Design a protein with these regions (language model features):
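Non-heme Fe(II)/2-oxoglutarate
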Residues: 1-144
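A short catalytic or substrate-binding loop motif that flags glycine-/basic-rich loops and adjacent residues
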Residues: 143-146, 181-185
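Extracellular structured ligand-interaction cores
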Residues: 147-150, 158-160, 186-190, 198, ...
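Conserved short histidine dyad/triad with adjacent acidic residue
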Residues: 152-182
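A short secondary-structure junction signal
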Residues: 162-166, 173-175, 199-205, 212, ...
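Short beta-strand His + acidic residue motifs that chelate non-heme Fe in jelly-roll/DSBH
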Residues: 164, 199-202, 218-230
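A short beta-strand-loop-beta hairpin characteristic of the jelly-roll/cupin
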Residues: 184-211
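A short hydrophobic beta-strand segment most commonly corresponding to one strand
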Residues: 187-192, 215-217, 231-249
Length: 255
């Protein structure tokens, strides 16, 4: 691994989240207006809570997180949480799970993952509802990363996203190994379209900053949870991708 790339990975492993709102001019107000107008029938519970995608695509627990938080174990099941999938593998917004090969043993592994991303990503049937979102990702974000998935999420009044981490069950052993992977680093972008008072996002026992249009770069390998005690819903855009050199440079220049 090149020195500058190694320094980037080490830096991104040191934080549970980072506010990077100043990186780009984000048209969050326009995107909020557009997604709020989407008909309710398109909104679905994340992961495979309302679908047959696991069986249909023969997904396993090594390359994707498949299960709705709280469906197993002692914690309550997440509730009041729905999403719109704008970019995935199939082009069908009902498919809320995206495979993300996260382990790079060699440069060849990285190139194969990148090739897979470029050949297997489609804008879904809901993308027409937010031309502003599509334009922002095509004209701005694509210069800095190859985007793998895009969700708009809505957490209703009283909604809870149960504490969890987004590491596939069969890949958790990699945390103690030497392989290069993207599980325990800043790996997911979280854009708050509208901040509502008393809605808290907590990563690694730390409350994230929140204000209209704020963009948080987060490590979803850390335990995290969200609760909305406001009477109004909160909307966010969540995405992941493979970083280009331009993004790595931007990050290291703004440490």
């Amino acid at each position: 691994m090149r020195t500058e790339t190694k320094e980037f990975f080490e830096y991104t492993k040191s934080l549970p989240f980072k506010d990077i709102t100043h990186f780009w001019d984000i048209p969050y107000k326009e995107m909020l207006d557009e997604v709020k107008s989407v008909d309710e029938r398109y909104w679905r519970r994340p992961f495979d809570a309302d679908n047959d995608q696991i069986d249909r695509m023969k997904l396993d627990d090594s390359k994707s997180v498949n299960h709705y938080p709280g469906m197993k174990g002692d914690l309550i099941e997440a509730h009041g949480w729905k999403s719109l999938c704008f970019l995935n593998e199939t082009g069908d917004s009902k498919d809320q799970i995206t495979r993300f090969p996260p382990v790079f043993n060699t440069a060849g592994d990285y190139k194969e993952t990148l090739k897979y991303f470029l050949n297997n990503r489609k804008w879904t049937n809901v993308s027409d509802f937010s031309p502003t979102l599509v334009k922002f990702f095509k004209e701005v974000i694509s210069k800095y990363m190859h985007v793998g998935q895009i969700f708009v999420t809505r957490l209703e009044s009283g909604g809870v996203i149960t504490e969890h981490n987004d590491i596939p069950e069969d890949s958790k052993h990699l945390l103690d190994g030497e392989q290069v992977h993207m599980f325990d680093m800043l790996n997911t972008f979280n854009l708050c379209l509208n901040h509502v008072k008393s809605c808290y996002s907590v990563f690694d026992n730390k409350v994230m900053p929140a204000y209209d249009g704020c963009l948080r770069w987060t490590n979803v390998g850390k335990k995290h949870w969200v609760v909305n005690m406001n009477r109004k819903p909160q909307y966010q855009i969540i995405w992941q991708g493979i970083y280009k050199k331009q993004f790595r440079q931007l990050v290291m220049e703004n440490k």
